[in-house]
């Protein structure tokens, strides 16, 4: 079976997933590919492990940005692909191989058939953490080429190929990591009265955290606290001196994020007093909500609805986190879901997006940026 050039690129990238700010092979792959393109109208910069590319327009009055994230996840792949990850314990399980490939496809199309306006492509590292969008946005490398508008996409396993799903306004939630370390006093299991058991303290803390959302967030708003990992103790007959909770917070409103964190801190202070222990809270990486510019999103959806190869869906907001929200906070633009029809979802070891979505997305986005970038 013959596959397209860009499907092959996706397969190449799929084999070399790398974690945040470690995407050296991916960066080099992108740079090597760019060297194959006509270069008289291209300028290239590197930023950490990312790549920024400017395609100079024929008669520019504005700059249109396209952002593609590059990093993978610490997941052991179970797809059965012949082109599965060659990096042990790492996988492109969130579609960033698709995102980067589509970006390279759009770059190729616009280099070979330039539009009037300038285009800037942001191949961004570390979306999965610790977060690359905000520092890239604030970097000296981007200041000179900062777009006037920007767009990005994310694959959506639940939608069929040919589907574009988005909405005006809030699309993705505010998110924050959550790490809580408890330290008490260890001891022999036979003498619990001489120790402060951090397994018990952690258990009480998990239970009490369940009240934060149900009793402190407006039922008409949405928020989630999930504790996904608990560690503590060393062996079965020693009372644990330390324990650690790892989780995530997600809220639709900025106000709810502050309220949730205030309540978490109050509950943790109560645990410290009740169990005579010390606690440290770390919120890790925090991502701003993805808020689509209303007018640009409406215009984009109207344009897409005229394409007979695309089905446009107005979706609901999701509790998904995306550091692209920082870019949209500073630059008007939007993000949309791209249907890839996979039985397994994002962050799953068996995620298998339909590669037919790649060339269709490139063709559609090329038509959109031509239309948008040639308007006066």
Curated annotation (Swiss-Prot):
Pathway: Amino-acid biosynthesis; L-lysine biosynthesis via DAP pathway; LL-2,6-diaminopimelate from (S)-tetrahydrodipicolinate (acetylase route): step 3/3. Its EC number is 3.5.1.47. GO terms for molecular function: N-acetyldiaminopimelate deacetylase activity. Signal peptide: none annotated. Gene3D superfamilies: 3.30.70.360, Zn peptidases. Keywords: Amino-acid biosynthesis, Diaminopimelate biosynthesis, Hydrolase, Lysine biosynthesis. The active site is at 69, 128 (proton acceptor). CDD domains: M20_Acy1_YkuR-like (cd05670). GO terms for biological process: diaminopimelate biosynthetic process; lysine biosynthetic process via diaminopimelate. It comes from the Bacteria. It catalyses: N-acetyl-(2S,6S)-2,6-diaminopimelate + H2O = (2S,6S)-2,6-diaminopimelate + acetate. InterPro entries: AcetylDAP_deacetylase, Amidohydrolase, Bact_exopeptidase_dim_dom, Peptidase_M20, Peptidase_M20_dimer. Catalyzes the conversion of N-acetyl-diaminopimelate to diaminopimelate and acetate. Belongs to the peptidase M20A family. N-acetyldiaminopimelate deacetylase subfamily. This is N-acetyldiaminopimelate deacetylase. It comes from Bacillus cytotoxicus (strain DSM 22905 / CIP 110041 / 391-98 / NVH 391-98).
């Amino acid at each position: 079976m013959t596959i397209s050039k860009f499907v092959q690129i996706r397969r190449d990238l799929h084999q070399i997933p790398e974690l945040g700010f470690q995407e050296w092979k991916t960066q080099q792959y992108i740079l090597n590919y760019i060297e194959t393109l006509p270069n008289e109208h291209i300028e290239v910069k590197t930023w950490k492990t990312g790549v920024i590319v400017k395609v100079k327009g024929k008669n520019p009055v504005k700059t249109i940005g396209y952002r593609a994230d590059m990093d993978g996840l610490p997941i052991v792949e179970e797809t059965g692909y012949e082109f599965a990850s060659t990096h042990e314990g790492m996988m492109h399980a969130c579609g960033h191989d698709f995102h980067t490939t589509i970006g390279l496809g759009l770059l190729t199309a616009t280099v070979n058939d330039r539009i009037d306006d300038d285009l800037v492509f942001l191949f961004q590292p570390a979306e999965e953490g610790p977060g690359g969008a905000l520092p890239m946005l604030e970097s000296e490398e981007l200041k000179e080429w900062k777009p006037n508008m920007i767009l990005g996409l994310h694959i959506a396993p639940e939608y069929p190929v040919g589907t574009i799903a988005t909405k005006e306004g809030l699309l993705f939630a505010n998110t924050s990591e959550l790490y809580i370390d408890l330290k008490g006093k260890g001891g022999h299991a036979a003498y619990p009265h001489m120790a402060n058991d951090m397994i018990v303290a952690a258990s009480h803390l998990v239970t009490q955290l369940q009240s934060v959302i149900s009793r402190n967030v407006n039922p008409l708003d949405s928020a989630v606290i999930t504790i996904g990992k608990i560690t503590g103790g060393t062996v079965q007959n020693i009372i644990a001196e330390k324990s650690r909770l790892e989780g995530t917070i997600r809220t639709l409103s900025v106000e709810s994020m502050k309220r949730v964190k205030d309540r978490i801190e109050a509950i943790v202070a109560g645990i410290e007093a009740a169990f005579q222990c010390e606690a440290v809270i770390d919120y890790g990486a925090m991502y701003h909500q993805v808020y689509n510019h209303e007018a640009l999103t409406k215009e984009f959806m109207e344009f897409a609805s005229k394409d007979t190869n695309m089905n446009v869906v107005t979706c609901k907001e999701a509790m998904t986190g995306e550091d692209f929200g920082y870019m949209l906070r500073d630059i008007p633009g939007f993000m949309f879901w791209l249907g890839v029809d996979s039985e397994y979802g994002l962050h799953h070891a068996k995620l298998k997006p339909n590669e037919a979505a790649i060339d269709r997305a490139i063709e559609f986005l090329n038509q959109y940026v031509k239309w948008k970038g040639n308007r006066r």
